Amino acid sequence: MKPDGAAPRRVLVVDDEGDFLATYERLLRRHGFLVIVATTRADGVAAVVRERPDLVISDLRLPDGSGLDVVRAARSMPEPPSVIVVTGYPSAETRQAALAAGATIFLAKPFAAAGLLAAVRSSLRDGDSTETAT
């Protein structure tokens, strides 16, 4: 959320599943965030550079490659945004790979709206905390 008078926080969501995108957009906009959407790895990486979001939420499995490329692109920025990785295929290996690439929070799909909001707020507040949630 934004302090009074401040510009809305910018959240880039990278996911190819329409239902999840609609949920992210509705929830985040309702809570005052400006939402930017990408549906492929390539578009996600380009949006990280072009839009300079405050937060990136990226699925791991994208139609043209790994969401880890989006994570790496985000974390390589001069002022890197926090990154939440989401996946419908959670495992110890995927969690470790996401955190090693620079994700700050790892969420397993499906998750409750309250869990996503808590992760978003934590990421924007703490920046570099590393957490796992389900």
Question: What is the predicted function of each stretch?
Answer:
Residues 93, 111-121:
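C-terminal output helix
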Residues 18-36:
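Two-component/phosphorelay signaling modules centered on CheY-like receiver
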Residues 51-57, 62:
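Active-site beta3 strand of CheY-like receiver
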Residues 80-90:
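A short, hydrophobic beta-strand element within the central beta-sheet of small alpha/beta folds
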Residues 21, 63, 91:
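The feature encodes the CheY-like receiver
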Residues 15, 59, 87:
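Active-site residues of response regulator receiver
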Residues 69, 90-107:
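Alpha4 helix (beta4-alpha4-beta5 surface) of REC/receiver domains from two-component response regulators
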Residues 40-43, 66-69:
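Acidic catalytic/metal-coordinating carboxylates
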